[in-house]
């Protein structure tokens, strides 16, 4: 059955297919007409499935086989009857899986191995519970293939604990007015989010209630019903209490053109959600609805008809819930950090990067202290951008963190740390960790003076050496600690790893007493990452003792930039290393 007109790879694939099936089964292969980009095709009868429907497996070798995988299709299509069967054919690979590459024999064997797994779920006499469980693992994919896509996406401002009505307002930004709707269980949540996004207070008096959030107790069927049968399809899978509330909401808001049903899939709290856009009145294309602050006054529900659904679509929904935002971090660190409070002194190029990473790690509250404005020269290595030029760094960064991560409380202060230690001591007394990255000796001295008297908060001082090839962190846990003896009277670290005899370490600028330490964004990222990891270990009680931590990246580059490296030698082939040890001794070496 090998055609010599085929490429050697296809011939090997066909031979592998015959060998895999065996002599008797291979005799059942029937040549079929090829389709676009196919060079060989066969049909093969397969055992009856649980529906009793006779089907045939279509096996096609694509033109660029084995770089392209074998094409397997079942006819007639078992879409919504077999797991992993789509309209276009069988889906042999799961989420983010790719077809393997290899020899023709390997590709044929892999494809049939995966097909055999699917067949085991559906052959006559197969276990229905196992088949249903396989459907449920990818249930939203099957629903998506049956539903159109709503023109409006949704932002759920928090995840409800139980079945709840959802108030709605539209995103006020012009580009999103009819594109995105905000949903929340309370009007106050909508007000807070509006203030966060628009920077204004909103008088949201009577918003529409077009949404309902409900937890599924069991899975509905994989096949979506016609629109007017949707409620019958859904309600058997709700708890009695949720079902009662849901039906009251659905009938009470039947005059709305669009209703949103947010389904939390069965499973533990925080399970994935799926949203249905239920449209009444018309199946005609629409462009999304505007939900204002008093929309509900237009739809009181009194003396208005309850329109049955005529169209059901899937809708994209995102959730601004802390657990959802941090769900990809499975280490458990975020749970421990929820109540952590960090005071960040200095939010320049290093401090801003640290603050942003801490916020994304799950810190509950972060206080940002910095007296400076953002300038154009800062943009190359700061997390803020051109729109923030001329703004106070602390305020602009707090706004960015709050806008990007609404579950984090960011509080800005445009002031000097040494002044706030006197005027607002509670800022520090209530902190778990204070991080200073100012490279300003006066603020560092003030903090170490306070720390030497004993504090409940830990202190982490971090800085980079010129050109960001080297960075350091000194960590002092709760208690009495003082690191002032490790620096000279000007605040220079006595145990630095680089020297800059040509004066290239600190660059003066034409202003009274002002200068900057040179370095790029990539080098600063190395230092920031080291500081963040140290801070997280301290906050989660993994590091409860004083430590000196250094990051070193390509120290040989110092010579090309006018410097001399005198720190620890790196082994051949090592480009980047992080060292951790006790504080250095005053005599000039590690403890």
Language-model-detected regions and their locations in the chain:
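N-terminal charged helix/coil linker that caps or initiates catalytic domains
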Residues: 282-342
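Glycine-rich phosphate-binding loop and adjoining beta1-alpha1-beta2 segment
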Residues: 371-406
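Glycine-rich phosphate/adenylate-binding loop
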Residues: 144-303, 429-433, 437-591
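Domain-level detector for trafficking modules
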Residues: 84-143
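S-adenosyl-L-methionine
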Residues: 404-423
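Glycine-rich adenosine-cofactor-binding loop
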Residues: 333-373
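A short, aliphatic-rich alpha-helical micro-motif
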Residues: 337, 427-429
């Amino acid at each position: 059955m090998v055609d010599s007109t085929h490429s050697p790879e296809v011939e090997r694939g066909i031979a592998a297919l015959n060998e895999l099936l065996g002599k008797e089964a291979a005799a059942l292969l029937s040549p079929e007409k090829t389709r676009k980009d196919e060079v060989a095709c066969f049909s093969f009868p397969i055992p009856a499935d649980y529906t009793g429907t006779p089907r045939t497996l279509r096996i096609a070798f694509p033109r660029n086989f084995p770089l392209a995988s074998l094409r397997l299709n079942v006819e007639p299509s078992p879409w919504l009857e077999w797991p992993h069967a789509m309209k276009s054919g069988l889906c042999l690979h799961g989420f983010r899986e790719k077809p393997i590459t290899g020899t023709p024999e390997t590709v044929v064997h892999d494809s049939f191995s995966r097909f055999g797994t699917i067949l085991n779920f559906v052959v006559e006499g197969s276990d229905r519970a196992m088949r249903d469980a396989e459907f449920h693992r990818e249930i939203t994919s099957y629903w998506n293939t049956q539903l159109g896509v709503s023109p409006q996406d949704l932002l759920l401002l928090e995840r409800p604990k139980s079945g709840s009505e959802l108030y709605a307002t539209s995103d006020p930004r012009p580009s999103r007015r009819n594109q995105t709707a905000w949903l929340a269980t309370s009007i106050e949540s909508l007000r807070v989010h509006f203030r966060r996004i628009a920077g204004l207070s909103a008088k949201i008096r009577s918003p529409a209630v077009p949404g309902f959030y409900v937890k599924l107790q069991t899975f509905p069927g994989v096949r979506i019903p016609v629109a007017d049968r949707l409620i019958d399809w859904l309600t058997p899978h709700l708890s009695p209490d949720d079902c009662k509330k849901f039906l009251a909401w659905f009938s009470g808001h039947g005059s709305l053109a669009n209703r949103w049903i947010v389904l939390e899939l069965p499973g533990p709290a925080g399970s994935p959600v799926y949203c249905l856009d239920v449209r009444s009145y018309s199946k005609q294309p629409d462009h999304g609805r505007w939900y204002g602050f008093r929309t509900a006054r237009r739809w009181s529900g009194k003396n208005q008809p309850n329109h049955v659904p005529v169209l059901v679509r899937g809708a994209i929904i995102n959730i601004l819930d802390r657990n959802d935002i941090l769900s990809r971090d499975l280490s458990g660190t975020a749970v421990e950090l929820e109540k952590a409070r960090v005071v960040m002194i200095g939010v320049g190029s290093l401090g801003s990067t640290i603050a942003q990473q801490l916020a994304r790690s799950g810190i509950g509250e972060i206080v940002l202290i910095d007296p400076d404005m953002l300038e154009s020269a800062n943009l190359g290595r700061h997390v803020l951008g051109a729109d923030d030029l001329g703004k106070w760094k602390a305020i602009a960064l707090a706004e960015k963190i709050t806008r990007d991560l609404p579950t984090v409380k960011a509080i800005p202060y445009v002031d000097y740390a040494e002044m706030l230690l006197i005027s607002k001591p509670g800022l520090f007394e209530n902190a778990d960790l204070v991080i200073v990255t100012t490279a300003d000796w006066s603020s560092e001295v003030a903090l170490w003076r306070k720390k030497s008297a004993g504090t409940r908060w830990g202190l982490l001082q971090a800085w980079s050496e010129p050109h960001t090839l080297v960075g350091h962190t000194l960590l002092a846990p709760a208690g009495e600690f003082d690191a002032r003896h490790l620096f000279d009277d000007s605040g220079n670290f006595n145990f630095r790893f680089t020297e800059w005899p040509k004066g290239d370490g600190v660059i003066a600028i034409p202003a009274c007493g002002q200068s900057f330490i040179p370095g790029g964004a990539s080098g600063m990222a190395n230092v920031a990452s080291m500081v963040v990891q140290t801070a997280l270990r301290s906050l989660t009680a993994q590091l409860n003792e004083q430590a000196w931590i250094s990051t070193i990246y390509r120290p040989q580059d110092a010579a090309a930039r006018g410097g001399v490296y005198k720190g620890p030698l790196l082994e051949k082939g090592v480009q980047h290393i992080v060292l951790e040890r006790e504080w250095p001794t005053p005599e000039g070496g590690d403890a």
